[in-house]
Amino acid sequence: MDDELRDRITEAAETNALLNAVKHDSEAQVGAIMGPLMGENPEFREYGDEIPGVIAPVVERVNGMDAEERRERLAELAPEKLEELEAEDEGEDHPLPDLPSAEEYDTVRMRVAPNPNGPWHIGHARMAAVVGTYKQRYDGEFICRFDDTDPETKRPDLDAYDAILDAIDYLGFEPDDVVNASDRVETYYEYARKLIDKGGAYTCSCPQGEFSDLKNNGEACPHRDKDAETTRSEFEAMVDGEYDSGEMVLRVRTDITHKNPALRDFVAFRMVDTPHPREAAEQYRCWPMLDFQSGLDDHLLGVTHIIRGIDLQDSAKRQQFVYDYFDWEYPEVIHWGHVQVDEYDVPLSTSSIAELIEDGELAGWDDPRAPTVASLERRGIRGEAVVDAMIQLGTSTSNVDLAMSSIYSNNRDLIDDDSDRAFFVRDSDDHGGLVERQIVGGPDAGEPPLHPDYEERGRREIPVTSGVVVEGDDLPDHGDRIWLKGYGCVRHTRDAFEYTGDDIDAVREEGVDVIHWAPADGPALRLRTMDGDVSGVAEPGLRNYDTDDVVQFERIGFARLDKVADDSDTESVAYFTHP
């Protein structure tokens, strides 16, 4: 590649990276711009192996710009493309509405607040996708705060912290701050003391059932009028671990006759005998409830906008009492409905998935049958495809259904151009098992294209001298013909395929089936799918690929290569991506 060509590639890559970043309001990806770059400049294609290294610094530079800088630079390089994009934007109904009162804040600062009791299922990705997209739209800040202050009921999983950060990275975002609530217990104690001094909290030793009866009747418990000094003393005893679980709580003094019983004198702190799994927090026994901890952190960490489930409307109302005591402004709130995901037999529940893994019914969090972010990544689905599908759900208060087909469609657009084609013949009862036949006459090898839309990439050479295997369901009756894709027309005679040399146009007119095949001595491969594992035989060229490469098994679908065997005695493994 000479310097002149390198400069042309660099300039074209910058235009495409800017266009991609501005259009999607996100960072550009090398893979996402390769297709348009090659499509608009066919002369670049012979340098396909070198181009990613040339354009990577360009993409990195574009990603270092803010939204306004990208638009200005695109206007310099390709004003007509920016005009087309703006015309599209004017006619587009953005699924994400503008944030309320965003213009009143110097910096829009939003958070995801996961409970790290396990890696994320697919539904969890929605919050990160939307918060990350708003961050990009407003050039704001993204906080990941682990709300890990329940060491017993929703006990944190130590592996989940990194797993969740990996999931956010997979989706294409990087938090500006990562905070563990369990590192901030002393801060919660400090504000509890201030609240007590303001008359906003009292210690209570009522049995839970007894207090519930009083609360539901709008009656105060005997401890409600306790003075601040006594409350402070008993709270310090809580902090020192002098009470057992259930023996003493600290309540926020609200309105005991409030029309909504859920808002009446709710618990701010309780005693927990189970130590926290994090060594840095294992000494604490007095733990804040989520509404107190989360509300406090939203203010102290400068959160301007909160997105939460419609079922958590009472949380904002409870937290408002605390905010009123401290004379704080409550953040802007968007409530949305729950998301349900189709296609999976496994519940969209962290605890349910964990139980299935523990029972051995799932191999792990990245099992293709699990509705998890880790599973999507291992299957070869790009995070951008997930984000785009989540964004299309909007922020309605109604419950929404996520069709996996929308993720698949997005991902197909991202990977199709770059995915070479390959043959894989499934040895399963569902497809009639494997059938082996010798080829009589004809060429020694088939030569299907690596990609039907990009002939310049070349062809795959698949030998037939050892015979071929096809799926039993594709085997024609004796005397009938089939077209072995990339090889030619054969007639099924006795126990062989006799090469006929018929022209493809004649075959099409007569309705002859076109099928995939593999050499009888091709490498063994196991395809892991949502319906279970399928073994079979692949074409030998598969050994030339690397782990993480995505190919399209013709007539089956896309698959990510998870393990590429380099000898005939070892089975390769691939994960089915989608049709």
UniProtKB/Swiss-Prot annotation:
It is found in: Cytoplasm. It catalyses: tRNA(Glu) + L-glutamate + ATP = L-glutamyl-tRNA(Glu) + AMP + diphosphate. Keywords: Aminoacyl-tRNA synthetase, ATP-binding, Cytoplasm, Ligase, Nucleotide-binding, Protein biosynthesis. Gene3D superfamilies: 2.40.240.100, HUPs (3.40.50.620), Ribosomal Protein L25, Chain P (2.40.240.10). GO terms for molecular function: ATP binding; glutamate-tRNA ligase activity; zinc ion binding. NCBIfam families: gltX_arch, PRK04156.1. InterPro entries: Gln/Glu-tRNA_Ligase (IPR050132), Glu-tRNA-synth_arc/euk (IPR004526), Glu/Gln-tRNA-synth (IPR000924), Glu/Gln-tRNA-synth_Ib_cat-dom (IPR020058), Glu/Gln-tRNA-synth_Ib_codon-bd (IPR020059), Rbsml_bL25/Gln-tRNA_synth_N (IPR020056), Ribosomal_bL25/Gln-tRNA_synth (IPR011035), Rossmann-like_a/b/a_fold (IPR014729). Its EC number is 6.1.1.17. GO terms for biological process: amide biosynthetic process; glutamyl-tRNA aminoacylation. A motif ('HIGH' region) lies at residues 114-124. Catalyzes the attachment of glutamate to tRNA(Glu) in a two-step reaction: glutamate is first activated by ATP to form Glu-AMP and then transferred to the acceptor end of tRNA(Glu). The keyword Protein biosynthesis applies. This is Glutamate--tRNA ligase. GO terms for cellular component: cytosol. Belongs to the class-I aminoacyl-tRNA synthetase family. Glutamate--tRNA ligase type 2 subfamily. Pfam families: tRNA-synt_1c, tRNA-synt_1c_C, tRNA-synt_1c_C2. The keyword Ion transport does not apply. PANTHER family: GLUTAMATE--TRNA LIGASE, GLUTAMINE-TRNA LIGASE. It comes from Haloarcula marismortui (strain ATCC 43049 / DSM 3752 / JCM 8966 / VKM B-1809).
